[in-house]
Regions:
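Mixed-charge (Asp/Glu-Lys/Arg
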Residues: 1-42, 47-192
Length: 192
């Protein structure tokens, strides 16, 4: 990737993270960017605190904390930060998905940008990553073998709760979240 493309991609990511911090604060929650102190902190972009909720057990004195990962993209299949092979290892996902995800689709319209936010809990992220990519790996007819080290992504239609219909190239994908949209579901920040 050319240096200017890397800069543009980094800028888009920084814009997405800043927009998410603002959205979280609009909900009445405290939030800050973890990347302000460590460049591209692994698996965590934003730390969010909700003083109205408390942690469980011995930590009930502490405000509820969410470790949020943000992915921003201008494609309708948003990369999720894992390879297709990694999505098929539930233990790996459980160890590496630290909290909820906010996936942002940036669309260029009328000379400006419009942003759509998809907020998915940690548990739902793991379930969708596994099931969607299991289907993509095993239920497609291909002339060439699939490269499992390729990036995995979530198509917007699946984040909107839509299935994939059967075609001559693949079986149908039955979305485990059929009819449930993750768009603007900020309350998912606090769900496991």
């Amino acid at each position: 990737m050319a240096k200017n493309n890397q800069s543009a991609k980094a800028r888009m990511g920084a814009i997405g993270e800043s927009l998410v911090v603002a959205k979280l604060m609009q909900q009445g929650w405290d939030a800050f960017n973890a990347n302000c102190t460590i460049k591209n902190y692994k698996s965590i972009d934003i730390i969010c605190l909700n003083s109205d909720l408390r942690e469980d057990g011995d930590l009930r004195w502490k405000p509820k904390t969410a470790l949020v990962q943000v992915k921003t993209c201008n494609q309708k299949n948003i990369p999720i930060g894992f390879t297709m092979e990694q999505t098929q290892d539930i233990k790996y996902l459980e160890d590496n998905v630290k909290g909820p995800y906010v996936l942002i689709y940036r669309e260029e319209k009328d000379g400006g940008s419009k942003y759509r936010f998809f907020v998915i809990s940690r548990k739902d992220f793991i379930k969708l990553a596994y099931e969607l990519h299991h289907w993509y790996i095993h239920d497609w007819e291909r002339e060439k073998p699939l490269v499992l080290s390729a990036p995995a992504g979530f198509p917007i239609k699946n984040l909107m709760g839509e299935d994939e219909k059967e075609t001559s190239r693949h079986k149908a994908f039955h979305n485990p979240f059929k009819g449930i949209t993750f768009e603007d579901k900020w309350e998912n920040i606090w769900k496991e």
